[in-house]
Amino acid sequence: MRQANTTDNQILSLIECNNEEVKQENSNKNPTINSVQRDYMAGEVSKDISRRLLLPPEIIEAHDQGIIHFHDMDYFAQHMHNCDLVNLDDMLQNGTVISGTMIEKPHSFSTACNIATQIIAQVASNQYGGQSISLAHLAPFVQISRNSIRRDLREECEMTGQKMDEKLFDAVVEKRLRNEIARGVQTIQYQVVTLMTTNGQAPFVTVFMYLNEARNEQEKKDLSIIIEETLKQRYQGVKNEAGVFITPAFPKLIYVLEEDNITEDGEYYYLTRLAAKCTARRLVPDYISEKKMKELKEGNCFPVMGCRSALTPWRDANGKYKFYGRFNQGVVTLNLVDVALSSGKDLDLFWKIMDERLELCYKALMCRHNRLKGTLSDAAPILWQHGAIARLKKGETIDPLLYNGYSTISLGYAGLCECVRYMTGKSHTDPEATPLALDIMKRMNAACNKWKKETTIGFGIYGTPLESTTYKFAKTLQKRFGVIPGVTDKNYITNSYHVHVTEPIDAFHKLSFEAQFQSLSTGGAISYVEVPNMQNNLEAVLQVIRFIYDNIMYAELNTKSDYCQVCGFDGEIQIVKDESGKLIWRCPKCGNTDQSKMNVARRTCGYIGSQFWNQGRTQEIRDRVLHL
């Protein structure tokens, strides 16, 4: 053992709610609640075991110094993976088993939605990252319900002796069907935000809305009805304790832009207008361009896993592409700013240090991989035996799923912006500095390709969505290198390849610039534009959406969606400094600063956060400039 147990103080402080670091570690967990505290206690034990027994000293040292970040150490003691695309289609069509109970193919849309939420909860409790489901997998059950409603209505007519002409009959069927679809969609929305998983939080789930995923025209029309209802209900929001509709954090929604919904004369353009209206009010959906994704992903369009982690195309033995039922093994992030500062602006030394740090990341990633190796399917039957990921037998290991690119493992990166600014004295948006930024991306890709060739494991680079870690990285950089203007003078560093939040740039130039980095971020990334309240300017939102379709694979619009429970203010709650210099949230109307009496929703790491953030991330949110 390298040291004795060190968890006592951490655990006691989080139980008594006086551990500021834990309080603001995750913007979707309320650390005062018993179930969340139990998860955090387990996390402290896992971190302690990982530090003392499971991870090599050089990995722990690099993690503590902020050279790398070994993600989710609080779950590393267990044999758990990160995120996945749930094969909901297989589970609904062929049945599944939940908690030892056989669940057969549902006989209605509403039942399918109910089963889907049970699957979501079970999956979330057996992994630590996000999951994605597709509404296309629910669409076949619309016709099943339609047929059932038709039968029931005919029986009612026969029983009552009532006669209906075919047109009226069909209208009544469709009205009842719409009501059932509304109930089913509402079930998913409310179950997701009210469920509590073993992780002490609502499931991190993404709902994918892709019309061209439907298998036939009727199914596509039915899918469009589900999408329409999903957007309408999200636009409305969910009620808080005061009974006021607010913006929920989950499920995250992704809407795919495609040929028949992107132009005004497109058959499904009305859905895109509804999506734009929803985004302007509720921050979602986010947008994937079918056109750009197909260019980058061998002609395929598919969901990201949770927030942004992306699979690479993979074919089965029959040469058929497969995406659902695949997963990510885990993430280790490289602090690019530390690489730059360690080089002292010597470019040759920079590349030497970069290669050394990449090897360190490889060792850390192999620790993640080896922790999963040998895991029995019995560890999480819902995942490995009953269809969410696979249909393995009891007692089988998951090893075959860890190789040959079936699953991915991610080399994350952060601070490309500050890294390049230090090395060149310029923003990476400057034409003189951009080539270095692209070379850094290519160097990381080359390393991943080399490792993949040597091991057959699906390495890929990933634009890390730092949440609390942004503050940690900033503080370790300041400690090691001091405060350097434009580089370490903030309490945060920039996520992935993003343009610095303070840099003036319009939405269209930002998306165009970042698109070239997104295409190099093979393991996933997302771009965003910061916008003011756009509810009265939907045409501008639609203009940005059309630009996304033509120029970038995956992007989102960030707006503000807040509510003060003291005075009823519905607008942007502001970030100000208190007497001690600490950043706090204050209602501009009544001055309320009690976080328990306000609802604040901001996008901080791809997901919407609603439980507030540490000082570093709060400063980053305050510093964001508008792009429109």
Residue positions per predicted region:
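Conserved catalytic cores of very large enzyme subunits
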Residues: 4-405, 426, 430-593, 599
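Flexible, active-site-adjacent loop/turn segments at secondary-structure boundaries
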Residues: 136, 337, 401, 409, ...
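Contiguous, well-ordered alpha-helical segments that form the cores/surfaces of helical PPI scaffolds
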Residues: 409-422, 442, 603
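Glycine-centered flexibility sites
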Residues: 412-415, 523, 606, 616
